């Protein structure tokens, strides 16, 4: 069926509205789970210097994440303006953090990039490279921190210290294998479900790891600042890495409850009080999740309203 066929246009409109409705429903469900009175109290009473420093790092983190899609722009060779790429990346990341990868990482990317004129095959490559970049940095940092034994696990936890070290070594081996393939593989093209992917150069792979690692470290620094710098920074970073993979396994939007459970289990007691941890994580959620999500929602509506004009401009430039 041709894309200009009336039935296709009708189906596209229906799918678009279903997507909008799904996003609104998820936002409402998420908002109901948040104790907004407690959130406001924590922010109002927080140390201003720590709060402002954390805000600055949040901006830095979102800008760094935008570089994932700029790397993908170079990788795919598409000609969308860099500012458009950064805007789409910001919107997708904010929705991804709060409403899951399916909504933010995949659904929103396909919606916005297609509205701006990119074909589905290119969008698939952008998403694939972006998610690969994100997890390469995670794997590298987690491999180093877990192998070094920075994270002290409590007795009778889900895994012991030895298992975590073995996991760390395994993660570093994944990094080594990826770099080897990027540097020496003779067959650099592969097709997955009809999508052609090209293995990047080893220099490009290093850029992926560097940018993503810095972003994860900035995220760790935000929580460390909000904890009042009372705990070793690398320990906080290690706990964040543990909680992130736990959040992926449990698959709860925004990792509600998972982040708090892991941090209180690994930090509470001799390191810092449970109340301080919960307050810091609440502040972190407000700064890194809630406020960017509200801004992303506004940006999304503005981008949707300008999409036709931008698409025409992009197609003329291409």
Question: Could you tell me what each predicted segment is?
Answer:
Residues 103-115, 144, 253-268, 282:
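Re-entrant/interfacial helical elements at transmembrane boundaries that shape
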Residues 112-122, 239, 243, 261-276:
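Interfacial segments of multi-pass membrane proteins
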Residues 91, 95-99, 122-143, 246, ...:
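Membrane-embedded alpha-helical segments of transport systems
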Residues 92-100, 241-260:
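Transmembrane alpha-helix interface/packing and boundary motifs in multi-pass membrane proteins
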Residues 109, 119, 128-135, 139, ...:
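Internal, well-ordered alpha-helical segments in soluble enzyme and binding-protein domains
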Residues 1-90, 147-248, 274, 279-281, ...:
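Predominantly cytoplasmic-facing regulatory/coupling regions of multi-pass membrane proteins
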